[in-house]
Amino acid sequence: MRVADFSFELPESLIAHYPQPQRSGCRLLSLDGPTGALTHGIFTDLLDKLVPGDLLVFNNTRVIPARLFGRKASGGKLEVLVERVLDDHRVLAHVKASKAPKPGTELLLGDDESIHATMLARHDTLFELRFDDERDVFTILDAVGHMPLPPYIDRPDEDADRELYQTVYSQRLGAVAAPTAGLHFDEPMLAALREKGIEMAFVTLHVGAGTFQPVRVETIEDHIMHSEYAEVPQEVVDAVLACKARGNRVVAVGTTSVRSLESAAKSSDNGLIAPFFGDTKIFIYPGYHYQVVDALITNFHLPESTLIMLVSAFAGYKNTMNAYQQAVAEQYRFFSYGDAMFISRNPQASTEMISLNSTDNQ
């Protein structure tokens, strides 16, 4: 398939720059995978779509204030976006500068340039930096870092984003982007779900900046996926197996939960799913056979992104592109701070034949 097959027209006005005043106050577009039927509603309708015994799987990663501004000690301005924390003092980071720093370059970071760091080495597109400070990396970032809002939210980060660009259940520090489907869940909503008998489990996937990188090839099969660290512990495996055994649905909250669960399934030698601790580069696009996830809660994604490809593999390509066309027509809010979808899996999606520009693709 071509990347261009996943393009759609999106007016700039539909990109949400701020979240709704109430987390669960967003709109919800429900897509029935087997039929393609669409239903318009609000996020709290989810309570009526789930039944006792269904399992919601959340990603409990916590976004770090990963963006730093500063300069080289020699003078040139730069911007640092931490991609991964290696230990208490070293990180891998994207560095934006007029001239890339060389190993040994001293950096002065933070709005007041109070943080000293050294560029140790370059690893492809990432730079290994060491913070020359007695405090650990997370403490430094919390003190001087900026929240790494997505590039399409065209405004400076604000103090409120430290709370709003974070799920209420986030625990594990390490993401540089929020698992945004989870932003819609507030404490009253979680309490109502528990009261109804909905089970909950938590995976961890530290979302990297690669989630916003455009696909730079014409044919999606040629795309090389970025790597992210994920954990699917034994208790999640047990919860998934118990859910399947009682005939209920595994409902992934967000594409990162999908990628975590499906990575754990692929790593299982015998059985449906096994514990998973490590880097995943799983790339899900039409033709993929889902092994674990039965339903998906997700936001609206960028045109030509790997995430709209993942959704197309789940709901079916035609169903997905039709839903997006309807969402634009009905003026749903898009991307990280936007509205949500609830999608049930289309069992025919993996064999759907797509005919575009007189070319049949599997």
Curated annotation (Swiss-Prot):
Pathway: tRNA modification; tRNA-queuosine biosynthesis. Keywords: Cytoplasm, Queuosine biosynthesis, S-adenosyl-L-methionine, Transferase. Transmembrane segments: none annotated. The keyword Transferase applies. Its EC number is 2.4.99.17. It catalyses: 7-aminomethyl-7-carbaguanosine(34) in tRNA + S-adenosyl-L-methionine = epoxyqueuosine(34) in tRNA + adenine + L-methionine + 2 H(+). SUPFAM superfamilies: QueA-like. One of its GO terms (biological process) is tRNA wobble guanine modification. InterPro entries: QueA, QueA_dom1, QueA_dom2, QueA_sf. It comes from the Bacteria. One of its GO terms (molecular function) is S-adenosylmethionine:tRNA ribosyltransferase-isomerase activity. GO terms for cellular component: cytoplasm. It is found in: Cytoplasm. Signal peptide: none annotated. Its main location: cytoplasm. The keyword Hydrolase does not apply. It is an enzyme of class 2 (transferase). Belongs to the QueA family. NCBIfam families: PRK00147.1 (NF001140), queA (TIGR00113). Monomer. PANTHER family: S-ADENOSYLMETHIONINE:TRNA RIBOSYLTRANSFERASE-ISOMERASE. Transfers and isomerizes the ribose moiety from AdoMet to the 7-aminomethyl group of 7-deazaguanine (preQ1-tRNA) to give epoxyqueuosine (oQ-tRNA). This is S-adenosylmethionine:tRNA ribosyltransferase-isomerase.
